[in-house]
Amino acid sequence: MAALRLASFTLRPAAAAAASASSGATPAAPRSASFARAARGLPSLRLAPPRRRGDLVRPRAEAAADSYASALSEVAVENGTLEQTVSDLEKLQKIFADETVAEFFDNPTVPREEKTALIDEIAKSYELQPHVVNFINVVVDNFRATILPEIVVEFENIFNSLTGTEVATVTSVVQLESQDLAQIAQHVQKMTGAKNVRLKTQLDPELIAGFTVQYGRDGSSLIDMSVRKQIEEITSEFELPDVPLEV
C-alpha cells in the first residue's frame, strides 16, 4: 500500500486579501470561550453496548461526532478562530490515526492523571488553542476518543459550509512546490466557483509521476494528470479484440 502524507494549503480570494492589507486594520483578538460550557449535554459512553454493533453503534457514533463538531464550531465562531481550530483538529487527526492513542484515552483502567499528562504534552508540542484542549478533555472524559477522526471530518464539513470552501485532495509522487499547489488551487476555484479552496496533499509512488486532483462532494470529480493514467490509456489503444482462430 502506498505511504500517504497529509498537509494543507489554503487559497483565499485575492480581493479580500488586498482589502485587508490596504486598510491596515489589525484583526481583533479572539474572545475566550469555553468548550466545556458549550459541550454540556453531549453524548457520553454507554457501558452496555448493543449487540448488533454494525446496525446501531455506527449511527450513534456518527450522531455523537456531529454533536461534538457542532459544539466546537459554536465556540470557534464565537472566538473568531475557525481557521486555527480546523488546523488544530487536523493535527489531532494525525495523532489519533494511531489506534493505540485512542485506546489509551478510552481505557477506564488508565488513571486520569496519566491521560491529563499526555493531553498537556500534546497541547504544548502542537501549540493547541485553549478551547481545543478543553475539547480534548471533554472527549476523553466521555470516553469518546475513538470517534475523534469522525469529529474532525464533521467539523471540516461545518467549516467548509460556513466559509464557502471547496476541499480538493492532490495526490503526487513527490511533494509539490507551493507555486504548483497555488496554480492547482486557482484552477479548482475557477472550475467550482468556490470562495475559498483548501488543498490536502498526499503521496502515492504508484502514480509513477504527475498528480491527481479529487474535489467535489465526496471527491466525486477527478483530474488525472498522472503518468500511470497515460500508460493505461496508451495500453488500452493497443489492446486487440479476441479473434477466434480456426484450426
From Swiss-Prot:
It is found in: Plastid, Chloroplast thylakoid membrane. The keyword Thylakoid applies. InterPro entries: ATP_synth_OSCP/delta_N_sf, ATPase_OSCP/d_CS, ATPase_OSCP/dsu. Its main location: plastid. Keywords: ATP synthesis, CF(1), Chloroplast, Hydrogen ion transport, Ion transport, Membrane, Plastid, Thylakoid, Transit peptide, Transport. F-type ATPases have 2 components, CF(1) - the catalytic core - and CF(0) - the membrane proton channel. CF(1) has five subunits: alpha(3), beta(3), gamma(1), delta(1), epsilon(1). CF(0) has three main subunits: a, b and c. This protein seems to be part of the stalk that links CF(0) to CF(1). It either transmits conformational changes from CF(0) into CF(1) or is implicated in proton conduction. The gene is ATPD. This is ATP synthase delta chain, chloroplastic. Belongs to the ATPase delta chain family. SUPFAM superfamilies: N-terminal domain of the delta subunit of the F1F0-ATP synthase. GO terms for cellular component: chloroplast thylakoid membrane; proton-transporting ATP synthase complex; stromule. GO terms for molecular function: mRNA binding; proton-transporting ATP synthase activity, rotational mechanism. It comes from Sorghum bicolor. Residues 1-60 form a transit peptide. One of its GO terms (biological process) is response to cold. Gene3D superfamilies: N-terminal domain of the delta subunit of the F1F0-ATP synthase.
